[in-house]
Amino acid sequence: MRERAFEVGPLNGHRGGSGSPALLLHGGAAVPDYLADLAEELADTFTTYRYTQRGTPPSGGEPPYTIEAHMADALTVLDAFGVDRAWAVGHSWGGHLALHLLVAHPDRLLGVVAVDPLGAFLEAFAEQDAARLRALSPGQTARLDEIEARRRAGKVTEAELVERFAIAWPTYFADRKKAIAPPTHVGAQASIDVNRSLVDHFERRTLIRGLPAAALPVLFVHGELSVIPVWSTTETAGLVPGAEVVVVGNSGHFPWVEQPGSVRNAVERFHAGLE
């Protein structure tokens, strides 16, 4: 697939493919966009618009780094290309962001594809942390806890966050030999602020309260062996009228990496059911 680079304000991204328009929203938060392979997988289904979110190189952008600001950026990208409505295809934190768009701006969406997303329930974090505890050494776990404490205190550095991803990265894959490279840049302030915004919305139960009113098609695709527990996705999907869930076997947090074609196949079957 041939992609073309674009700049929309401070955001740097790429567009390509053919079909219905779709925003591709990466996870992290505050890491460079890594969804090129997913865009390639979906190139015959969607015209994709993917970009690195604000506050992280190669994109710029000043604060605020909140869920609201990231939603506004997504709509700005659509506006820049004259797209009235699009699919929101998000992975991990990006899937969570897509669900917020569904609640706050359904008039700008055609539907949502949430790939191994952070769901609506804060309790999933405890199980995710427990899974990492089993997979990492005590020293690695202690270092992750130390860095996370510094992030919560607003004192973390980019180098520490890059180290954090390097330690935790193998746990995102069922087969570590298939792991893609971890991020080498993290927007430190963006990471701090997005996580604070996440906590605020979890406490306000934004998605739990808003998703039952959704009236657009929503597909969840989740790795069977992901560090994010499958129940987080199935229970989040249970809040959305008519939502469908596909669990990808022998896959961790990146289904399109460990089981190439799995996300495309799920989307194609889902679209066929809408016709």
Identify the role of each PLM range.
Residues 9-60, 77:
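Conserved HGGG/HGGXW glycine-rich cap/lid loop of the alpha/beta-hydrolase fold
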Residues 84-128:
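Conserved hydrolase catalytic core segment
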Residues 112-151:
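Flexible "cap/lid" loop of the alpha/beta hydrolase fold
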Residues 148-201:
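Conserved alpha/beta-hydrolase catalytic His-Asp/Glu region
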Residues 214, 220-222:
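Short beta-strand/loop motif that positions the catalytic acidic residue
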Residues 227-232:
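Conserved alpha/beta-hydrolase "acid-adjacent" motif
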Residues 243-275:
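Catalytic active-site module of serine/aspartate enzymes centered on a nucleophile-bearing elbow/loop
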